[in-house]
Amino acid sequence: HALIEEYKEKVAATQTDKYDRVVMLYTQDEDAHTSYIKAAEDKGYDVLLFDQPVIDTHFIQHLENKLENVTFVRVDSDIPENLIQKDEELESVLSEEQQEKVKVLFEEALGEDDKSKLQMKALSPNSHPVMITRPEFMRRMQEMQAMQGMDMSGMGDFYNVVINTNHPLVAEKLIKMRSPEKKEKFASYLYNLARLNQHM
């Protein structure tokens, strides 16, 4: 318990959210989440490695209940800017009209996918152009149901597709392409890169 308190003090300065909770970022698969870990570390965050079978969703919830003002968030559950909720917001370099055009391109790239939610976000130009995240709450619920042997086929695998409207590949290259076919192919290419990043 002393080690957890020491770690909490170590990360409190950079990993305290707007609700005054210390957010402990973690991964259970370092190889699968390499780019997410790097993105979090680039923001000055520290990521715990929970690669032992005993550290499961139940154990994490037990820790959250036991520790005061602490929450655990898996590093791939949201974009780096939202892992630790702060009141900071960037503005998009794209107009609302341009954002809508980009959104339509990515909706076509996703096709009829009812398991995903498309979001346009003004993020750092250094973040990925497109990111796929799995909400912490949904993922935990699925893991708990799987451990209890419950059928989750009706739930599906829900995820967010986040388009970084400030990334040069979106804000400059994609917007300035003249050919609609090239725009569609490029949007699809960026989406597929994000899927590869999530091992989908």
What are these regions (language model features)?
Residues 1-200:
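Long, intrinsically disordered, charge-dense linkers/tails
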